[in-house]
Amino acid sequence: MINIYEPNIKNYCSSAIKGINDGWISNHGEFINKSTQKLNEFLNTKYSILMCNGTCATHCLFLSLKFKYPDINKIYMSNNVYIAAWNSALMVYNINQLEMMKMDINTWNINTDENYILSLDKDSAMLIVHNLGNIINVPRLKSLRPDIIFIEDNCEGFTGKYNDIYSGTSIDSLCSSISFYGNKIITTGEGGAFITQHEDIYNYMIKIYSQGMSNVRYLHDIHAYNYRMTNIEAAFLYDQINDIDNILKNKRNIFKIYEKLLDDLIITNKIKLFKTDNSTLSADWIFSIRIIGNTKSIEETTSFFRELEIDIRPFFYPMYKHSHLSILDNNDDISNILNKEIIMIPSSPNITYEEQQKVVNSIYKFILYNYNLNIFEITDNNINLLNDFINKIKINNDKNFRYYRTRDINCIKNHIVTILLFDININSRSAIGYAHIDYSDDTYWFGIYLDEIYRGNKIGNL
């Protein structure tokens, strides 16, 4: 099974081992301060607080909003996001104070059309969620609506940018949250961070996140929480931030490979990637595709890939589908389309090129499956069927069967169609297309065939 995500932590353990050997395993120890300083330097932010997970940090966004702007009674929320965003909001506000926004079919984020943003209520707040690492240009929204208070769930957008600064660090945001969960670009297992550029918010939150203790030990003067990160988690964070350039370079390369291998499906509009906002740079967190016109259910789609030993995830459900949020209105058909058509595919930092090829091959197969075609894959056990078919083509002098002699072997291996060998009906020999390499003599040939009834339909690379 090619898992959806596996952390690559083995090279970032030295500081954690030191922390264990030194006996500093709780929220005290040298790596709390060291990691905080490193994170501030990397993000070029004034204040950060390391926390035990991203959800706690997101909860603190709403606590900060309530503290600074107690009279705000409407918070605009995104649809189709990980549930932590809404659960965090509901820990501070009641559901009637939350209003769900429309979604954008192209960015898979909230609709940021100027007319729509200008139509929103005055003196409200908005939670920005950078879905799947696609960054929303918050400074642009603030310029359109200076009266709206913005807070950012940056748990999936960490390392993304808007206007050449890291997402979640703009003065236009009250504060933002980061997740260092096991499937994130940087991981501490669990873990997260709270970011702000505002001193009053920092001073409030530094007390709230650590039991609300007064100047007298064990006397507490405010309702607060224990959201502290451990020194061991901070040690993992410290080692990774020190190598952040290489970590990001590796992830960018993985994304570039997927983009190249999937290029034909993108060109032929079989799949789409998300569209980015102007002046933004997305975070290379988890590669996702939208399968245009997917006729299969989420369960059928997931099952298909699992049978091919590919672990995928569906896009986040419309919020009204969660039982405790079922009273929400969902007048946005786009949210249902995105939920059905988008899948997240394996994006581990240590995924191999061969594994990426296998993932892409499974996507090609699913596209055919989505057309309700009976797919038959030629293997070594039934290669004689293919040879028999090829001989018939030769006899009939089908000019659409093309031969390529003395092709470079790497070129053949990298050509996606050489890996996909499909047959619709073995008995009638009606086929979408074949690819075959014959090593029967010193030279070899490479052939592609596309059945007449499928020509011009732009199926796969054929």
Model-derived features: positions:
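Conserved N-terminal entry element of GNAT/NAT acetyltransferase domains
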Residues: M1-I2, L368-N384
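N-terminal "arm"/small-domain region of PLP-dependent enzymes with the aminotransferase-like
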Residues: M1-S26, P346
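Phosphate-binding glycine-rich loop
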Residues: H28-I75, N80, S88-I95
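PLP-dependent aminotransferase class I/II
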Residues: F31-K38, F42-I49, A125-V129, I135-V138, ...
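PLP-dependent aminotransferase-like
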Residues: S64-N154
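Conserved active-site segment immediately N-terminal to the catalytic lysine
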Residues: I151-T188, V216-L219
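Acetyl-CoA-dependent GNAT
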Residues: F389-I453
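Conserved acetyl-CoA-binding loop-helix of GNAT-fold acetyltransferases
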Residues: L450, G456-L462
